[in-house]
Amino acid sequence: FGTYGHPRPRFYYNP
C-alpha cells in the first residue's frame, strides 16, 4: 500500500 492518489503518509508504494 502507499499513496494511491492520496497525500503520502509514512509510506510511498510499499507492498
Swiss-Prot record:
GO cellular component: extracellular region
UniProt-annotated location(s): Secreted
Secreted keyword on record: yes
Signal peptide (residue range): none
Keyword terms: Secreted
Tissue expression from the record: Expressed by the venom gland.
Keyword Secreted: yes
Main location (coarse class): secreted
Function: Does not inhibit chymotrypsin or trypsin.
Protein name: BPTI-like protein
